[in-house]
Structure formats: C-alpha cells, structure tokens
Amino acid sequence: MLLQYKVISKIKKLATGNLSLFLFANALYSLSTGLINLLSPFILYTGVYEDFIYVFHNIMMLTSIFAVGLVPTMLRFYKYDKKKYTCYYLLTSTVVYAVLLLLGLFVDNPLSAVLKITRSSLSENFIIYLSVAFSILYVFNRGLLTAQNRYKNITVGIVIIFVVRIVALLLIAGLRITNFNLILLSVCILPFSYELVAYLKSVLKVSWSPLKDYGAFLVFGVKISIVGILFTSTNQIFLIHTKGVDGSLAAALSFAGGLVGIINILSTTMSSYFLGKLDARNEASIKSYLDKVGRFRGHYFLALLIVCSLIFAVILNIYPTNASQVAWLCVVTLLQTGIIFYIGLYSLMTKTFNLLNRQLLMNLLCFASVFVVVSFVPFSAEFVVLEYSAVSAVIILFELMVARMVLRHIANMKKIVGL
C-alpha cells in the first residue's frame, strides 16, 4: 500500500508540475493550430483554401518574427528585477502592437509585398495584421506568466483558445463560410479576445520604472530578434519563391509547415522554460541539463521517425491533390523541424552564455547560403521535393555549427568536466 501511495503521489506530482502544465497547455494550443491547418483543405473551397492557408502560414511566421526576441529577453532579465523588467516588457510589447496596427492601415506596405500577402482591400489587409497582433498578445502574455510561474493561468487561457477555435471551425464547415475576413476573425482574432483583457489588466497593474537600464534590455532583445528573424526568414525563402512560381505548390508547402506547429510550439516552450532556469554561473545546472538532453536523444529521434511515417501515410491517403508530392514535402518539413528542435536544445544556450554575436554571424551566413541556392538553382515543380530537401539540409548544417560552437565554448571555459 505504501509503495502504491508513493507511485500515485509521484504521478500526481508529475501531472500537476509546472513543466507538465506548460507542455500540456502549449500542446493544446498547437493542436488547435494544427486542426486549422489539417481541416482547411476539406472545409474550404479550393480557391479560398489556397489563399487562406498561405496567409495563415504567414500570420504564424510574423507572430514568430515579432515575438522572437522579447520573450527570451524578459525571461533572462526578470530574475534580476521583476518590477523593472516587467515594465520594460509591457512597454516594448505595446510598441509592437502599435507597429502592427500601423502596417494594417497601409495596403501597399513593403512587408506585405515581400511576403506576397498584399491585398486589394484595406479591410483584408488590416484584419491580417490584426490577426498577427492578437496572436502575439497570447505569446507575450504567456511569456509574462511563465516568468511569474503562473502556469495554471496559461493553461486556462489556452483552453479558452482551443474551445473557441473548435467552435469556429465547426461553424465555418457547417455554414460553408467563404468570406476571407470572417474566416480570419473566427480562427485568429475571437479566440484571443481574453488575451486582450489580460494584457490590459497587466498594463493597469504595472509599476512604471525609470528607463535608465532600458537601453541594455532593448539591445539584448534586438540581438535575439535579429538572430530569430534571420532564422525564420531563411525558412521562408523557398516558400516565398515558390509562391511567385506556383500557387498550388506554395499552398502545399504552407500546409506542410502547419503540420510542424506542435514541434515549433514545443521548441518555444522548452526554450522559454529552460531560459528561465539556466544560469551560466551555476555549473552543476548546466552539466545536469546537458546530461538530460544527451539521454533524451535516442528516444526522441525514434519518435520523430514514427511520426514522419504516420504523417506520410495519412497525407498520402487524404490530401485532395498531388498527395504523394505533398506527403514527401510534409516528411521533409517534419524532419527538418524535428532535427533543428533537438539541436536547438544546445544552441539556446547562446543566450545563457551571451554568444549572440557569433550566432548572428552564423544565421546571416545561413540566410545568404539559402538565398543563393534558391535564386540561382532553376526551380522545377517536378523536383521540388529534392530542392526543398537541399535547402533544409543547409539550414540543419548551420544549426549544427551553432550548437557545436556552444559546446566548444563550454569546454573551453573548463567549468564542466568531461565535455
């Protein structure tokens, strides 16, 4: 009985622990995003689907770009002065929202032109950037709650998002909605309404601090942002190039990209969680972390291969057009994202050891390499899987180089024995 009680207590503790709640909440959010991606070919007409899925993919990408630097910066600095850095965080996030709303007011803004999401209607353009702003509301609120260890609040917020999105998908399917604005309003804005309330509450509660250290906070955040933007943009080069050549293939690539949402969310989740825990001054915690990541390797890659096999089989049988080609694109995307997620468990420590300048250089070289490959290798719809695989291999190679750089830096510091 005593053993049974201990086992039950341990399971209960694991299930209600901070990391478990965090993983569950973010997996649920990823599931809601994945369902939008997976069901949209079947609940939307072909023309509406190809337009929507490309824009939706870019909304998710813009969310990553605008949020990539601020949340890690907050998690790194929060432990030093909670009051001051909460103030800086909310101030910066407010500026981000203002920039997005401003972009929404200009149909011919350069960002839309680069991403090939320019609309003829001001209302459609505005609702795209409003969707990005509401999505970022969730990301920024989650970052603040993570710093405050309020994981139950994160879970409640994501359950609300999940339920509203499911209802929205049912209504879109049942009513055969084709209006672009209404679709985005249903799946990208209304589900995050509560996040706007949470943000306003945080702003009203914050104690405003002097801005004497805001420059250092901002510089660190800008460095992380540039690193993240380069990485995210590198992944988009092939998609944007494809959009200019073949809209159907661009839709297929956007669909494939949507399937890796759970890995991307898991990556963000793990990075956010561990950035708040890892400290360069604590040798034991760094060594323990590296040991855990190493032990995790075999099981992780076995699971990744199983998932890739299952996804290939499912897509091959359900995707409405060019199923074989789309299935292979999905597998390549999953492998690339899955491998980079694991490598990223090492490379995230560039922030812990302040190696951002070196990572910035590597990401810049990676961006340039992919740009050259995409620009000068003739595009062929017949060999799109091979071309996409080559681009993915280049990205993985540079991420490996960043991880290697981090491990070499740790070894050179002679803080951890045996590396």
State each model region's role.
Residues F77, A133-V156, L335-M362:
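Membrane-interface junctions at transmembrane-helix termini in multi-pass inner-membrane proteins
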Residues N37, S64-D81, V260-A284, K351-T352:
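Helix-loop junctions and terminal segments of transmembrane helices
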Residues N18-T33, N37, I160-I161, I183-S202, ...:
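Transmembrane helical elements of multi-pass membrane transporters/channels
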